[in-house]
């Protein structure tokens, strides 16, 4: 693929190649150092440090046209020089950015100074760069718009790594901007220098090291286009400090230079391909839909498709909410901790319609046995995913939304001819639902964590935006909260990054100020980014925290119980010297940040406690003490098959 810095420009309106899209990996855009051009007409000498370090005088606004046919009002005159940092911030404004999650440092100070001169961009100040990137993810996942995070060089930049990897695996549109040491110091092991472009090469869709201030408008435009087009993902822009300080007159009319990428973006699906899929549906007796994160933007079309066909829907962890979990045709989640009936449906299906999924190991278990009786149709926007893990019988590289629209038209036009009826199959699955419902046991006054989520679902009528950390609580939140719409469910699915839930809730609350946002968290995950309580308080965000506290690293402990004879290997998170006390005291963390908090230990008191949490204005933490013996069930052991499914037992049982 051509590099992003190719000399052959292509505009947004250029027609894509008429050829079939070639296989394309998200890793195929190499970074390059753009040579500094001789542009003395636009630049001021770097030596005038007195000018660079003085406040920038803002000229009267001048209207300029943007690419989106809206009038953008710049705070600078068209021919007025301004710092590279101000050009960067204005480039963000021109992309419609309203919020960034930025933590300052020496190499990014100029960017922060420029942000203070912006009247349209709000900075939500995290208390750790990882909190900032996870908050940007929460913003993006809940809104569908790209999330923006900014960090300084060195440790600030490396603190973004987990968030970038998470966004890459879960296809989240993210633009990360990092400060870098001045160009002359790059490669000298300067203070707080890390080669963040090299560090993040394999965990970003693309990244840039800006070597010419003139390139900032083009690079920012490309970064947003890359992050949001095709299969979304993170893009990193590394900006040396001297570039931020350099004075220049920006050229906002530069075209993007992405000819290779543009020519390989997927084409609209061919009608003949969609007709072939409809034919397979008409010939099947036991079809099932397997939908993932690639279907989140297609919920309306998916709903219509299910209405026209009557095919039951199983969802991945990423796909929760693309089809209402409370609908009778929903099988909820499939995979390792999916419902028995969802996994039964895949096991016994004769046609698997895989839309926007990647056949990952937590869904498939043993690949050879997964959907072994079924013909497989795979539709995905990333051709690298098709055939990567499971070879389909029919594949379409394209947008799931467009494919569903096309199939819906075919189905509507041929409804009388097709007369699809899968009633017998649906009855069989209904029997499985009755035989193997999601359930839990109650022991005395102890609070089952599943019950807490069930009550939250009832009291919020399934309308809350839910974020989670990673572990048992994450799986219970996936199972027992009935998501009605896409972008209600925010969770680190592919990477499984603990500490995600609290900052993600911050981003979701910023993006959706009128929504109920609840972080369902575990004590292990919560404490990994507990410092973000300060951000919640300072920003006065109405984030609710339902903390399922079992004093253990629950999911690892569950595996210890099942596969290691319950030998505890550093999974107890309390104080061994005071096992009868709750440690640490999460209420004191909340109190230190001025956030109301309460603890509940008895099942009979739980409903009222959750209602109080929801009714209290602003943020609130509810510490729900749960027994550590609970296991997430059902469970198919790693690498197992449907016949290996576990439906009984917990930490009170010996294995």
Swiss-Prot record:
Enzyme Commission code: 2.2.1.6
UniProt main location, coarse: plastid
Alphabetically ordered keywords of this record: Amino-acid biosynthesis, Branched-chain amino acid biosynthesis, Chloroplast, FAD, Flavoprotein, Herbicide resistance, Magnesium, Metal-binding, Plastid, Thiamine pyrophosphate, Transferase, Transit peptide
Gene Ontology CC: one annotated term: chloroplast
Pathway(s) served: Amino-acid biosynthesis; L-isoleucine biosynthesis; L-isoleucine from 2-oxobutanoate: step 1/4; Amino-acid biosynthesis; L-valine biosynthesis; L-valine from pyruvate: step 1/4
Positions of FAD binding: 231, 337-358, 380-399
Compartments reported by the entry: Plastid, Chloroplast
Family as reported in the entry's similarity comment: Belongs to the TPP enzyme family.
Provenance organism: Brassica napus (Rape)
Domain of life (superkingdom): Eukaryota
Residues that hold thiamine diphosphate according to the record: 129
A Gene Ontology BP annotation from the UniProt entry: isoleucine biosynthetic process
CDD domains: TPP_AHAS, TPP_PYR_POX_like
Binding site for Mg(2+): 523, 550
Cofactor: how bound: Binds 1 Mg(2+) ion per subunit.
Protein name: Acetolactate synthase 1, chloroplastic
Region: Disordered, residue numbers: 1-24
SUPFAM superfamilies (UniProt xref): DHS-like NAD/FAD-binding domain, Thiamin diphosphate-binding fold (THDP-binding)
Cofactor(s), names only, from the UniProt record: Mg(2+); thiamine diphosphate
GO molecular function: acetolactate synthase activity; flavin adenine dinucleotide binding; magnesium ion binding; thiamine pyrophosphate binding
